[in-house]
Structure formats: structure tokens, C-alpha cells
Amino acid sequence: MSPIYINLMMAFIFSLLGTLLFRSHLMSTLLCLEGMMLSLFIMVTSSALNTQSMITYVIPITMLVFGACEAAIGLALLVMISNTYGTDYVQNLNLLQC
């Protein structure tokens, strides 16, 4: 396994740990999710370039679309929650009350 893949897996694991450890603020959770998506995108793109199959070129583009949708929805929720509650603390939110 090349050092690039090891570094990308470490970046994914550190982003996952950041998501688990720093889940008190919504903004830090969104940043960790973006780090996970970026490391997955780079891994999939580099593996698609190594296999040189036409079907594998579609997967990174699909991941970019899902990543952009995830970022847009996350930022919209962050703005809505910060305007409604005045903070981005996840503990203060009760999603069952809407």
C-alpha cells in the first residue's frame, strides 16, 4: 500500500474521530464531515485513475455531487438553527419539537 493511501486513510480516521469527539458544535461536526468527504473523494479518484476503467470515472463525479448537496444542506441547517436558537450547540437542540 502506498504512503498516499495511508495518509488519506489517516485523514479519514482523524476526521471520523473529530466527528465523534467534537460533536458539541454543529459547525465543527460539519467541518469534520467535509474532511471525511474530501479524503474519500481523493481516494476514489486516485483508485479510478489506477484502474483506468470508464465506469470508475463516474464515481468521483457522483461523490462531488453528494458532497456539494451535503454541504449545502448542512450550511442551511446551521443558519436556520443559529437564527432560531442563537447558538450552534447540538446539546440544546431537541429535534422532536420541530
Swiss-Prot record:
Keywords: Electron transport, Membrane, Mitochondrion, Mitochondrion inner membrane, NAD, Respiratory chain, Translocase, Transmembrane, Transmembrane helix, Transport, Ubiquinone. It is a multi-pass membrane protein. InterPro entries: NADH_UbQ_OxRdtase_chain4L/K, NUOK/Mnh_C1-like. One of its GO terms (molecular function) is NADH dehydrogenase (ubiquinone) activity. The keyword Cell membrane does not apply. Gene3D superfamilies: 1.10.287.3510. GO terms for cellular component: mitochondrial inner membrane; respiratory chain complex I. Core subunit of the mitochondrial membrane respiratory chain NADH dehydrogenase (Complex I) which catalyzes electron transfer from NADH through the respiratory chain, using ubiquinone as an electron acceptor. Part of the enzyme membrane arm which is embedded in the lipid bilayer and involved in proton translocation. This is NADH-ubiquinone oxidoreductase chain 4L.
